[in-house]
């Protein structure tokens, strides 16, 4: 099952530093997800100045419980980078200029 995550970073004065400090662990954690095909697409949400203020994630898990289990281990969650996360079921239609089944 595919999911769309829209995750907003905190807006406190330490938010940017928290993201920077945790970013390496975040990428180490998502690398196996990419290799297993669970992470279909992802990237940072930017403000008008080009600063990272959140993330968009298109992920594929067998069910919502498995997605929730991943979030309990995701460094951006455990270290307080993402403060507000919207999660919606999603069906990917186009990826890299190709229509997906």
Locations of regions flagged by a protein language model:
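Conserved, structured core segments of small domains
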Residues: 1-101
């Amino acid at each position: 099952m595919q999911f769309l995550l829209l995750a907003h970073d905190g807006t406190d004065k330490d938010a940017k530093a928290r993201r920077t400090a945790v970013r390496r662990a975040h990428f180490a954690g998502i690398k196996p997800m990419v290799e297993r095909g669970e992470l279909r697409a992802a990237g940072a949400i930017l403000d008008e100045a080009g600063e990272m203020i959140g993330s968009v994630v298109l992920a594929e898990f067998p069910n919502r419980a498995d997605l929730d289990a991943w979030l309990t281990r995701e460094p951006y969650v455990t270290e307080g980078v993402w403060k507000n996360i919207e999660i919606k079921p999603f069906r990917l239609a186009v990826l890299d200029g190709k229509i997906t089944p």
